[in-house]
């Protein structure tokens, strides 16, 4: 037991030293600098395993004001078999966020990917409607009042701006969007409800134009869409904001090579668009990135801040 006690003490000492080195090195906080300009948050994506890494957690706690669950709130994680829900990973992240004063963006309720086969196999309209409503209601009820915003539907457009083929669009047509948003609004009226997508980098691109066109139509029909989430730059961000939503956010930012200028341009784009409320980078360290080979994040594989990190701080 004495040996074990010494081992635990040593681990704790190393963790505290690591955290201390990180905090000493990072005199500024991106979140504090960003929110000083009137924005709501500068956040990151994470999950339980990453938050249990001491170096990663120290950076999250020090530098970021918002968390998006990378995988733990997706359908295959929360409802892998019909009616049997698992909230262990999502609970951990939400509890951590509450304890450390971080906002949470729920990600994601309706997505064609990471979808259990039992959902993909549904071909009956009434069955899918019931399943969709039950899933959204169960997940959102658990975290009611604890989530700043939800990505209600995710990546539903093709590159030409048409609706993507999925079990939802095949069986329900575009009405699945109405069903999803109306259900979400009824469960948690205080949460901001988002439609989220990628490759919305140009105002003239077909996908961007399709997003704006559909959102305008859905808003006119009374569908309660509050925001559009994207990884984008100024021209497209302005176009998305003009769709009639009350806010937009940059939700899944990572840039291959982590160009300082590209990162600064994105930050400035959000600062320049009044409706842009926040930025979320998709991870902390290149070590844990889903595309680590392209070194896309603000911290390298040794948890050291990169040039892009320092450039953002300087720009703010």
From Swiss-Prot:
UniProt keyword Ribonucleoprotein present: no
The record's listing under InterPro entries reads: GH10, GH10_dom, Glycoside_hydrolase_SF
List of catalytic residues = 155 (proton donor), 252 (nucleophile)
Where found in the cell?
Secreted
Query: Which Pfam families does the annotation name?
Result: Glyco_hydro_10
Q: Which SUPFAM superfamilies match?
A: (Trans)glycosidases (SSF51445)
Q: Does the keyword Transcription apply?
A: no
Swiss-Prot/TrEMBL keywords: Carbohydrate metabolism, Disulfide bond, Glycosidase, Hydrolase, Polysaccharide degradation, Secreted, Signal, Xylan degradation
Q: Where is the signal peptide?
A: 1-19
Q: Which domain of life is it from?
A: Eukaryota
- Please name the pathway: Glycan degradation; xylan degradation
Disulfide bridge map: 270-276
User: What is this protein's expression induced by?
Assistant: Expressed in presence of xylan and repressed by glucose.
Molecular function (GO) terms for this protein are:
endo-1,4-beta-xylanase activity
- An individual GO BP term: xylan catabolic process
* Documented EC number(s): 3.2.1.8
Primary enzyme class: hydrolase
Q: Which reaction does it catalyse?
A: Endohydrolysis of (1->4)-beta-D-xylosidic linkages in xylans
Domain GH10, residue spans = 44-315
> Gene3D superfamilies from the xrefs?
Glycosidases
Task: List GO terms (cellular component aspect).
Answer: extracellular region
Give the protein family: Belongs to the glycosyl hydrolase 10 (cellulase F) family.
The protein's job, in short, is: Endo-1,4-beta-xylanase involved in the hydrolysis of xylan, a major structural heterogeneous polysaccharide found in plant biomass representing the second most abundant polysaccharide in the biosphere, after cellulose.
Q: Can you name this protein? A: Probable endo-1,4-beta-xylanase C
Per the UniProt record, the source organism is Aspergillus fumigatus (strain CBS 144.89 / FGSC A1163 / CEA10) (Neosartorya fumigata)
């Amino acid at each position: 037991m004495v040996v074990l006690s010494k081992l635990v003490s040593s681990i704790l000492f190393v963790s505290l030293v690591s955290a201390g080195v990180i905090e000493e090195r990072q005199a500024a906080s991106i979140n504090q600098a960003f929110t000083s300009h009137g924005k709501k948050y500068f956040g990151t994506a994470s999950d339980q395993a990453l938050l249990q890494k001491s170096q990663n957690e120290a950076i999250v706690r020090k530098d970021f004001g918002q968390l998006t669950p990378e995988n733990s709130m997706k359908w295959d994680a929360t409802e892998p078999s019909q009616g049997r829900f698992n909230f262990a990973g999502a609970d951990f992240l939400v509890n951590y966020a509450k304890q450390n004063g971080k906002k949470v963006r729920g990600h994601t309720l309706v997505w064609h990917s990471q979808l259990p086969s039992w959902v993909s196999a549904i071909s009956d309209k009434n069955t899918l409607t019931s399943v969709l409503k039950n899933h959204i209601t169960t997940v959102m009820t658990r975290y009611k009042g604890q989530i700043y915003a939800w990505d209600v539907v995710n990546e539903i457009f093709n590159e030409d701006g048409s609706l993507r083929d999925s079990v939802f669009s095949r069986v329900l047509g575009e009405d699945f969007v109405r069903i999803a948003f109306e259900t979400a609004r009824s469960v948690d009226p205080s949460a901001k409800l988002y439609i989220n997508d990628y490759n919305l980098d140009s105002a003239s691109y077909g996908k961007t134009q399709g997003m704006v066109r559909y959102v305008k139509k859905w808003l006119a029909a009374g569908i309660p869409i509050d925001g559009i989430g994207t990884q984008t730059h100024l021209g497209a961000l302005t176009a998305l904001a003009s769709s009639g939503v009350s806010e937009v956010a940059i939700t899944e930012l990572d840039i291959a090579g982590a160009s300082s200028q590209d990162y600064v341009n994105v930050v400035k784009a959000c600062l320049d668009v009044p409706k842009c409320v926040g930025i979320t980078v998709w991870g902390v360290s290149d070590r844990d990135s889903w595309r680590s080979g392209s070194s896309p994040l603000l911290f390298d594989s040794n948890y050291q801040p990169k040039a892009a990190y320092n450039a953002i701080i300087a720009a703010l």
